[in-house]
């Protein structure tokens, strides 16, 4: 093999931004998914940095974060739901779109990361990560699984509280010694 091309994460983000233009941003499900993906992308980078991974694996973790739910957009367009059991497995569908339909090459030219990306996306929404992965494949599968779950937790708890009760505004209140 020749020299491995570095992952251009900024280009991948531009491609993602173009890709999601194919879907209605005023659809609440689409808007929710875009914001979720962007948070997971950032969280994947943060987890990789916490693990002291090299730049290549940190960028790869971030790229996987960006791609992990790519199947969700067509899932919503076709089935109008995020429930895999009522439609399709979005991890498997994302891998189909990326690799069978060739979309992955718009995000990254080099194919040397394909197996890691594929296995991470396939496993991110499974109850258990499949056995037989290489150490590096397993690491990236765990990073995306954890980043995804952390954001789901955030959306279901913190964001819901902030939206429902205005907790974000309450946190700006001055703390005093006065007793109510």
Residue spans of the language-model regions?
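An active-site-proximal "capping" alpha-helix that borders the catalytic cofactor pocket
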Residues: 39-47, 88-103
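Short, Lys/Arg-enriched N-terminal segments with co-localized hydrophobic residues
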Residues: 1-5
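Acidic/histidine metal-binding catalytic segments
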Residues: 52-63, 104-122, 136-143
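Short coil/turn segments at secondary-structure boundaries
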Residues: 81-89, 105-109
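Active-site flanking loop/helix segments enriched in acidic
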Residues: 13-39, 71-84
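Divalent metal-dependent phosphate-bond-processing catalytic cores, especially two-metal-ion Mg2+/Mn2+ enzymes
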Residues: 7, 29-34, 38, 42, ...
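His-Asp-centered metal-binding catalytic motifs of divalent-metal-dependent phosphohydrolases/nucleases
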Residues: 58-83, 91-94, 116-127
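Primarily interfacial, aromatic-capped hydrophobic alpha-helices that serve as membrane anchors
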Residues: 100-107, 177-180
């Amino acid at each position: 093999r020749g020299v491995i091309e570095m992952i251009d994460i900024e280009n991948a983000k531009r491609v993602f931004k173009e890709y999601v233009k194919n879907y209605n941003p005023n659809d609440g499900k689409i808007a929710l998914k875009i914001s979720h993906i962007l948070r997971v992308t950032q969280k994947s980078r943060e987890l990789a940095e916490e693990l002291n991974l090299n730049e290549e694996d940190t960028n790869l973790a971030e790229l996987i974060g960006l791609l992990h739910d790519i199947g969700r957009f067509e899932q919503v367009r076709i089935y109008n739901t995020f429930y895999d059991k009522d439609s399709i497995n979005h991890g498997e569908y994302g891998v189909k779109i990326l690799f069978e339909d060739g979309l992955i090459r718009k995000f990254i030219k080099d194919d040397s990361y394909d197996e890691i990306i594929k296995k991470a996306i396939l496993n991110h929404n499974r109850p258990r990560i499949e056995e037989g992965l290489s150490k590096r494949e397993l690491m990236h599968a765990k990073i995306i699984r954890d980043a995804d779950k952390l954001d789901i937790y955030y959306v279901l708890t913190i964001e819901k509280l902030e939206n429902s009760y205005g907790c974000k505004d309450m946190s700006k209140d001055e703390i005093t010694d006065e007793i109510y």
